[in-house]
Amino acid sequence: MEPVSHQDMPRLSWIDTLYSNFNYGTDGYDAEGNEEHKNSREGSETMPYIDESPTMSPQLSARSQDSVDGVSPTPTEVLLPGGESESDKGLLMRKLVLSGVLASEEIYINQLEALLLPMKPLKATASTSQPVLTLQQINDIFYKIEDIYQMHKDFYDKLCPIVQQWDNKTTVGHLFQKLATQLGVYKAFVDNYKFALETAEKCSQCNVQFFKISEDLKVKGPKDSKEQPQSVTMEALLYKPIDRVTRSTLVLHDLLKHTPTDHPDYPLLQDALRISQNFLSSINEDIDPRRTAVTTPKGEPRQLVKDGFLVELSENSRKLRHLFLFTDLLLCAKLKKTTVGKHQQYDCKWYIPLADLVFPSLEESEPIHQLHATPDYEIEEMKAKISVLKSEIQKEKKSNKGSSRAIERLKKKMFEYESWLLLYSPTIPFRIHNKNGKSYLFLLSSDYERSEWREAIQKLQKKDLQALALSPFELQVLTASCFKLRTVHNVPIISHKDDDESPGLYGFLHVIVKSAKGFSHSSNFYCTLEVDSFGYFVSKAKTRVFRDTSEPEWNEEFEIELEGSQCLRILCYETCYDKSKLNKDNNEIVDKIMGKGQIQLDPQGVQSKNWHDDVIEMNGIKVEFSMKFSSRDMSLKRTPSKKQTGVFGVKISVVTKRERSKVPYIVRQCIEEVEKRGIEEVGIYRISGVATDIQALKAAFDANSKDILMMLSDMDINAIAGTLKLYFRELPEPLLTDRLYLAFMEGIALSDPAAKENCMMHLLRSLPDPNLITFLFLLHHLKKVAENEPINKMSLHNLATVFGPTLLRPSEVEIKGHMNLASDIWSHDVMAQVQVLLYYLQHPPISFSELKRSTLYYSTDV
């Protein structure tokens, strides 16, 4: 973690945080319930009229008209007909801006009406023997609301007929000038706001009747709308005037931009803008920022140290949250739903003072019984769908007739798929406890990321932290500041990337983890490798544990598939054999991280076919490794073996004829060993074996070594499984043959079950006997593996995902004849390849003899 620099940390005055979250369009409400209405405000990433310099007291900028970029609700090129003068277009934009003001004012007035509605009955009961609130409490809560309501009601009533009977010569400047001169009433409201909130909160705690009233105020929709009244809390409505006070300033800038300088309104609007800016500047000067939540209890500025999107497991449901780590507290927020054209808003879900935050030990943690991990096949299918959509988007862009609407539709669908993947793929638990007993659980995809969060929090906890409790007002202000302070603006998905950003690498990265130096003591060490895939990091490989040394030498090679990857991470662990610290969850990593580091995968630097040596330094530890990259189109090519005496890269018919067997010896031996001692191995066939072990087995089988059985019995089971996959991958043509590839693709796409059955069985009969017998032998084995799914976590879907693209691939002729890149073919066909194998895996047992003599299937020749 880089040291926190005070110079780089943005700081906000409380009025800046209040006024940085607004939008002069119509207000929207989250429909999830009352809880979602609390602390609601409009958000805007762009604040052209408020100085955002990193000071404690940012001031409003009185910029000239020419320096202002106006905010227009609709693109002018869509709205404005051709042939009009610039002056006419500007005046039309004036009307559009004013129409937006009217719609916004109507909603704001409805909100104020909803807030005032309970005031009269409350006052009526105040003089009775059983008052709900005292007259003083009512005045404190509703202070200046009536004046603000009347001010905006008068403005709306006068502006509405002018806009409805629009004429380019019509003037509205006098209305905005009058509204600006009345802004002083907001000053009184702002000064009383915190006291009004505290009074309302105390009254809600003491009086059940008032609590019910304050939690369910009904705001009606626009008069021409059929929308039902929405339920909003009093706390949220009391914030609306503060949220509103700067909107007239934005509107004035827009009106000035689209008003000719010789128009009668121009000097009036300039005067209104001057008055409004002076008013807001005076508020900046009058308010003491130390009263607010942007300072710590010790009066020091509260700074944002780290933020990011994480998945929280809440009430047995996954929720995407934005986590903010400040110098003295951790705040968890959600992005509120907003209507089209509106900016994002945050809603605080909870916060923990760092003085009260603890990380539970494993013996204190409860196992995550309620967590149901998403099946791997669903994750892989979603990745395949995303790849297909990416290819379709590229096709649309390259096409001369490419429709921007079609591209946007595809991007929207891709965003939905990526959001699902981001939510359901993480499985590594990250627990946080409050000393008061409340606990929270996040799920991450990367132990690297979990370590970063833990280290950042623990570093801050070494300081002299004081207990704190934020008032509702302070929490509102802090949540509002998150929008401006955040460093991570978008969820980490690839559809957010611009076209000119690097798309990352697609293909296979070969990594040899050699050795490590710099450990202070002898112990048992190992490394894991992570790469980013579809916007988030995933653990891809793990070395063996090198025992009782301070200078481990692994010298292990791994083949890692890259899917738009841009970064490689290496984590170095020391094993923990304390039985009290054994993991309670399958995905819990309890070993100690000794160091971690990462390097960028530069497309230019790794495209070389030669090995590239590198070193990653981490906490005084140096890990040496080498890597090289092979593109995806190269991996589609099957290179025949130059030595026909071997088995790898040799036609299966040649091998079976030479061996005088129906199934190649390598297939039989690997399957026998897996069924003997790997049938219950978690992730069998999915977890990569050590590349050097696989190459050793490959060489032994090619040489027909007498020691092969001894090697198999001593070898890691994942290496044996990897050898079997490598054999099928290196066949000169896939097991299901090049000739039948398109027929399999068409057959699996049939909708009628009977027609599909007929076609798929006919295709099996069309295979050469060695291919068919070997395929049926493999099917029988994979079904046995899937029978142990509760233990090995490998379902039929998972196995189909692993073997489908290996047994069934397009031929090189089809690749060359395809207009798009090989990666496009890969993306489009991978789902179908998986579905073909899955169809046969889910089918009742298929006998070679019955299949050959069966008269059930009637089909024309392929």
From Swiss-Prot:
Residues 488-616 form the C2 domain. Coiled coil: none annotated. GO terms for cellular component: axon; dendritic spine; membrane. One of its GO terms (molecular function) is GTPase activator activity. Residues 650-848 form the Rho-GAP domain. Residues 34-44 have a biased composition (Basic and acidic residues). Transmembrane segments: none annotated. Residues 303-462 form the PH domain. Its main location: other. Residues 93-286 form the DH domain. It is found in: Cell projection, Dendritic spine; Cell projection, Axon; Synapse. One of its GO terms (biological process) is intracellular signal transduction. The central Dbl homology (DH) domain functions as a guanine nucleotide exchange factor (GEF) that modulates the GTPases CDC42, RHOA and RAC1. Promotes the conversion of CDC42, RHOA and RAC1 from the GDP-bound to the GTP-bound form. The C-terminus is a Rho-GAP domain which stimulates GTP hydrolysis by RAC1, RAC2 and CDC42. The protein has a unique structure having two opposing regulatory activities toward small GTP-binding proteins. This is Active breakpoint cluster region-related protein.
